[in-house]
C-alpha cells in the first residue's frame, strides 16, 4: 500500500530527481520565471520555498545549508541579499504556478513557475 508516501517519482532515480530539482531551483532563482511540466512545477515548490524561508534569516550556517542545496555561490548571494529581504514579511507562498496549456510533442500539461512580487519583464526559460 502507498499510504502516507509523499512526493512524485517522475520516472527517475532518486539521485536524478535530486539533481533535476536542484538545477530547476537554481534556474528559478536566477531567472525568476521558468516553464516546465505541471507535476515538476508542483514538486519544485517543495524544494524552492524552504530555501527562500531559509534565506530570510541571514547567518553563516544558513548560507552553508543553502549552498549545500544549490551548489551555486551566485544564487546563495541572490537568495540572502535580494530574495530573503524581498519576502521578509511574507509567511510562505513565494511561488506562483500558472498553467499554460499542453506541450506539442506529447501533450504534457505545462506550467509557468514564477516568484511572487518579481519585477515584470523578460522571457521564460524552459526547464524541461
Curated annotation (Swiss-Prot):
Instruction: Please give the InterPro entries that the UniProt record associates with this protein.
Output: Ribosomal_bL17, Ribosomal_bL17_CS, Ribosomal_bL17_sf
SUPFAM superfamilies the record matches: Prokaryotic ribosomal protein L17
UniProt keyword list: Ribonucleoprotein, Ribosomal protein
Q: Which domain of life is it from?
A: Bacteria
Any one biological process term the GO annotation gives: translation
Give the signal peptide as a residue range, or say none if absent: none
Q: Which Pfam families match?
A: Ribosomal_L17
Q: Name one GO molecular function term.
A: structural constituent of ribosome
Name the Gene3D superfamilies for this protein.
Answer: Ribosomal protein L17
- What's a single GO CC term here? cytosolic large ribosomal subunit
- Subunit record text: Part of the 50S ribosomal subunit. Contacts protein L32.
Q: Family, per the entry?
A: Belongs to the bacterial ribosomal protein bL17 family.
Q: What is this protein called?
A: Large ribosomal subunit protein bL17
Native organism is Pseudomonas fluorescens (strain ATCC BAA-477 / NRRL B-23932 / Pf-5)
Q: What is the lineage of its organism?
A: Bacteria, Pseudomonadati, Pseudomonadota, Gammaproteobacteria, Pseudomonadales
Q: Which gene encodes it?
A: rplQ
